[in-house]
């Protein structure tokens, strides 16, 4: 990918927009972890050898209506923690977990955040066509298929108000990027982490988007009973 040169611009922000940008752009700041939905035996959460059923059995109870774990066969199995009230930029610094992005939930999207030095490193291993599952404490499992992987460069990596460049060198604000990624709703799943480059931990952003799949796909996965490696299957998306 080729990116054009960057120039600094200054734009006015309303207080609401500033809050959104701070929540979206500052999530990579390391903060103290919260304790929620850990694995009972504290085994490595990213261990790809776990089956979905084994992973679900090890999860602790999550808040009502919240996902307790993220699972991608042969790739990752991560418990999910929640952001503390009033901390929209919080991302856990606990190894082997991912954090649900509360602001994204308001727009019908399940957003999961992780530092690229921790569980976010597992996100970079994912590929389009793979299936992901969200596990809930009540036994419910929601299945998704990864449909897009997008990368953006921060024009000012150390600024909370940085603009971003997409792969075509189009420049957009953090608020515009948030809208593009999270405000489409439709029960999408989005995984977000930072991209490190040239010694800068927050040089860019990685977004992995997954769409809900039909009951037909869920049935096929159940029949496979773990024998099928869930990669690059051509299945219809839910409507």
Role assignments for model-derived ranges:
Residues 14-17:
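Alpha-helical hydrophobic membrane-insertion segments
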Residues 36-239:
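Solvent-exposed, non-transmembrane regions of membrane-associated and secreted proteins
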Residues 19-29:
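Bacterial N-terminal signal peptides
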């Amino acid at each position: 990918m080729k990116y054009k040169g960057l120039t600094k611009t200054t734009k006015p922000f309303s207080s609401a927009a500033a809050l959104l940008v701070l929540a979206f752009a500052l999530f990579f700041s390391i903060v103290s972890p919260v304790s929620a939905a850990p694995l009972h035996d504290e085994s490595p959460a990213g261990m790809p050898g776990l089956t979905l059923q084994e992973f679900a059995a090890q999860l602790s109870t999550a808040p009502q209506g919240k996902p307790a774990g993220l699972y991608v066969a042969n790739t990752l199995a991560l418990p999910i923690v929640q952001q503390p009230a009033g901390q929209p930029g919080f991302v856990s610094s606990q190894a082997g977990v991912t954090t649900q992005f509360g602001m994204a939930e308001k727009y019908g999207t399940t957003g999961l955040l992780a530092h690229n030095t921790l569980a976010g490193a597992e996100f970079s291993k994912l590929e389009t066509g793979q299936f992901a599952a969200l596990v809930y404490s009540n036994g419910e499992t929601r299945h998704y298929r990864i449909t897009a992987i997008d990368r953006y460069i921060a024009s000012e990596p150390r600024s909370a108000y940085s603009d971003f460049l997409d792969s075509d060198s189009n420049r957009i604000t953090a608020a515009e990027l948030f809208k593009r990624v999270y405000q489409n709703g439709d029960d999408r799943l989005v995984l977000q982490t930072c991209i490190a480059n040239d010694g800068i931990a927050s040089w860019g952003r990685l977004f992995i988007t997954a769409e809900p799949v039909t009951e037909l796909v869920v049935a096929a996965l159940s029949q496979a009973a773990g024998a099928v490696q869930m990669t690059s299957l051509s299945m219809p998306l839910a409507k």
